[in-house]
């Protein structure tokens, strides 16, 4: 069975409220839809709800400088995860990440994907106390936003061809080796095995997809 490495993670159904009710004062960085789904279940409401929308360095630094020194919670997709990571890192505040969809691995990576100069720049070094994976929260999202999570895993395989081509053209900065793609083959096998569960949105299928994301995130920072 595939064994992932990475951040501390808790899996379960309807577990978000328990975490939010137990962490004391916090700022919530989120998108509207997942918070609407969870808000009525949470007794310990956030001091402030901030909608994730701008990933420019200037905006994120200003945001980090103004929030109070309390627990930071990211709830949502990749932009919410990246915003929460930046605030946590800049201020060295405790961080909990709650992805609302399994479409990307942002909750398991340490850098934030900043939008600068018409492109993406990866900066920062965030390590959350805990990542909460709530199956009921996932199942509240549109089905395509759940199944699209296979794309990040598939890209781990297709990217090897770009790296090999760069090596053959004398433009490899990282030292391509023929043995390097073996891990992506492991990912593909696990993905093929759990694909029916992902489509059916079973607990097992969703957990195995997120464990793949977790391992990819860990390997980004080996």
Q: Model segments located where?
A:
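Alpha-helical scaffold segments in soluble metabolic enzymes
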Residues: 18, 22, 62, 86, ...
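Glycine-rich beta-strand-to-loop/alpha-helix junction loops that act as flexible
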Residues: 31, 75-77, 214
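Residue-level detector of flexible, active-site-proximal loop/helix-junction positions
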Residues: 54-56, 79, 102
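A glycine/threonine-rich phosphate-anchoring loop and its flanking beta-alpha core
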Residues: 89-187
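Active-site segments that bind and position negatively charged phosphate/pyrophosphate groups
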Residues: 176-222
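Short glycine/serine/threonine-rich phosphate/pyrophosphate-binding segments
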Residues: 35-37, 79-86, 104-107
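ATP/NTP phosphate-donor binding region
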Residues: 1-71
């Amino acid at each position: 069975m595939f064994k992932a490495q990475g951040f501390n993670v808790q899996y379960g159904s309807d577990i978000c409220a328990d975490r939010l009710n137990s962490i004391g004062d916090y700022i919530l960085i989120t998108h509207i839809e997942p918070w609407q789904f969870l808000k009525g279940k949470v007794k310990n409401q956030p001091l402030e709800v901030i909608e994730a929308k701008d990933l420019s360095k200037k905006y994120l630094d200003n945001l980090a400088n103004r929030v109070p020194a309390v627990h930071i919670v990211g709830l949502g997709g990749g932009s919410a995860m990246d915003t929460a990571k930046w605030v946590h890192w800049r201020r060295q505040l405790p961080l909990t990440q709650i992805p609302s969809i399994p479409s990307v691995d942002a909750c398991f990576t340490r850098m934030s994907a900043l939008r600068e100069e018409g492109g993406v720049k990866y900066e920062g070094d965030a390590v959350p106390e805990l990542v909460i994976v709530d199956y009921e929260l996932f199942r509240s999202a549109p089905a395509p936003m759940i199944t699209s999570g296979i794309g990040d895993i598939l890209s781990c395989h297709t990217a090897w061809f770009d790296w090999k081509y760069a090596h053959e053209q004398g433009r490899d900065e990282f030292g391509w080796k023929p043995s390097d793609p073996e891990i992506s083959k492991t990912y593909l096998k696990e993905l093929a095995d759990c694909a029916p569960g992902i489509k059916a949105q079973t607990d097992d299928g969703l957990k195995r997809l997120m464990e793949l994301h977790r391992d990819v995130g860990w390997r980004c920072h080996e």
